[in-house]
Amino acid sequence: MSASLPRPLVHVGVTVPDLDAAVRWYSEVLGLVVLSRGATVRAGEGYEGDAASDVFKAGFGEVRIAHLACGNGVGLELFEFVRPAVEPSREDHHHARITHLCFLAPDLEEATERVVRAGGTRVTEHSWEVIEGQPYRFSFCRDPWGNVIEFHTNSFEQIFSNQGTDSAGQQ
């Protein structure tokens, strides 16, 4: 089994209150490719409804789902829960959940301004070095629905593979 590790990340699921607007936003602002949009799945209706009921458990009624693809083939699965309806996201980041999505953007300022012009907000006041003294930079913003988006100037492997220490400075 270890011969097939590390496992590739296939997709990330994100809940939004307006699926159609989110599909437009992620495709127009971040350039993701729309693979499917707006499939409706209802509890008790067919195979998909039974599977969704098993995943989302008691209280699940209806969800709309769209699938988008990033430039490296990793998917973004967007969910708009209809029954029960989507509730606003909590702003705190210390609860167990996915904290952000990170996209490659060699021009951080251009990427951040594009998000802001399209209804998102800036989180960090400016870009920062990922590791002090090294050329790799990041910035954070939010999409119009409050989901946190990070931009990196370089790939994850470029930034972290040759550091030789963990984040606490331990060998």
Q: Language-model segments: which ranges?
A:
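A short local loop/turn or secondary-structure capping micro-motif enriched for an aromatic residue
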Residues: 85-88, 156-160
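Basic/polar N-terminal segments that are highly enriched at the extreme N-terminus
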Residues: 1-5, 163-171
